[in-house]
Amino acid sequence: MAIIGIGIDIVNLERINKIILCYGNKFVKKILSFNEKKKYYELKNKKKNISVNFLAKRLAAKEAASKAFGLGMKKGLYFSQFEVLNNNLGKPYFKFNNTAKNLIKALNITNIHLSLTDERKYACATVIFEDNRTNIILS
C-alpha cells in the first residue's frame, strides 16, 4: 500500500461552543450529514458538552479528510457528503457520498484510516488515504 494523502486537524472545543451559540442549527446543518444530525440532537438532549465534542470531532475529521484529498473544500466537496460512523467496537470510519465518493474512485483510494480523539479543550483527527500501489524505496 502507498500513502497518497494525509490530513490532520485540531479543533478548539470552546470555539465550537461559541459558534453553536452564535449560529446554532445553521452551523450544525453545514457540518453534519442527516444521520449525524440525528445523533447530535440526541446527545444534545442528554448532555450538552458531549454534543459539542461530537460535533468538533466530526468537523476535525472532515477537515482532515479534505486535506488528505489535497483539495481542501473545493471541487464540489461539502462536509455533509462525509459521514463519520462507528463500527460495533467504536472505531470511527467514513461513509462518503456524491462528489466525495466519486473523488475516492478517481484517486484509486482503497484504504482510509481515521483516528479521532478529544481532551478537555481540543478535538483532533488524523486521516490517511492509501491506494494499492507498492511503496517504492529509493536508495
Swiss-Prot record:
GO cellular component term of the entry, any: cytoplasm
InterPro entries: 4-PPantetheinyl_Trfase_dom (IPR008278), 4-PPantetheinyl_Trfase_dom_sf (IPR037143), ACPS (IPR002582), Ppantetheine-prot_Trfase_dom (IPR004568)
Catalytic activity annotation: apo-[ACP] + CoA = holo-[ACP] + adenosine 3',5'-bisphosphate + H(+)
Pfam families given in the database record: ACPS (PF01648)
Domain of life: Bacteria
Record's keyword terms, sorted: Cytoplasm, Fatty acid biosynthesis, Fatty acid metabolism, Lipid biosynthesis, Lipid metabolism, Magnesium, Metal-binding, Transferase
GO molecular function: holo-[acyl-carrier-protein] synthase activity; magnesium ion binding
One GO term (biological process): fatty acid biosynthetic process
Binding site for Mg(2+): 9, 63
The protein's required cofactors: Mg(2+)
Location in the cell: Cytoplasm
EC number annotated for this UniProt entry: 2.7.8.7
Family stated for the protein in its record: Belongs to the P-Pant transferase superfamily. AcpS family.
Alphabetical list of HAMAP family matching this protein: AcpS
UniProt-listed NCBIfam families: acpS, pantethn_trn
Function: Transfers the 4'-phosphopantetheine moiety from coenzyme A to a Ser of acyl-carrier-protein.
Protein name: Holo-[acyl-carrier-protein] synthase
Lineage, opening ranks: Bacteria, Pseudomonadati, Pseudomonadota, Gammaproteobacteria, Enterobacterales
